[in-house]
Amino acid sequence: MKYVIGIGTNMGNRLENLKNAVYALELAPKTAVIKKSAVYETSPVGYAKQQDFYNCAVLCESAFEPHEMLGICLGAECGLGRVRNFKNGPRVIDMDLLLAEDKIIRTPNLIVPHPHIKERLFVPVSYTHLTLPTKLEV
């Protein structure tokens, strides 16, 4: 199944954090990173008193079902040092399952397409890059 995963960070070495998150996906079993978007700097949403975010999106293919893929993302976040102090607060890494092919999922733990996909300004541009024939490096 193909997935679009949004990745963001606004703590520490933001570019290195993005690279580490992509690498975590590359290391995941039964999962291949197909394409990476460019990196975008965006303002925080919800809680403004924090550093701007670096964001990108990754197109990957995996044998895992959506809830399992969410688990991979959450595990990668934990492994990269994510601590959830408060909603919309600063974070070393954030990995969101934005799309899972044409699936529509509404469960307590997972909503796909991601419920805030329209509010994230980097998502449409990143998605466009992911569907272009050229490879962009993160």
Residue ranges and their predicted role:
Residues N10, N55, D94-D96, T131:
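Acidic active-site catalytic centers that drive phospho-/nucleotidyl reactions
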Residues I7, Y127:
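Short, histidine-centered active-site or binding-site loop motifs used for metal coordination
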Residues K2-I5, M11-F86, E101-D102:
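Nucleotide and nucleotide-moiety/phosphate-recognizing core
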Residues I5, I72-V123:
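Catalytic beta-strand/loop module used to bind and position nucleotide/cofactor moieties
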Residues H67, H114-H116, H129:
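Histidine (H) residue identity feature
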Residues T128-T134:
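Conserved small/polar residues in nucleotide/adenosyl-binding loops
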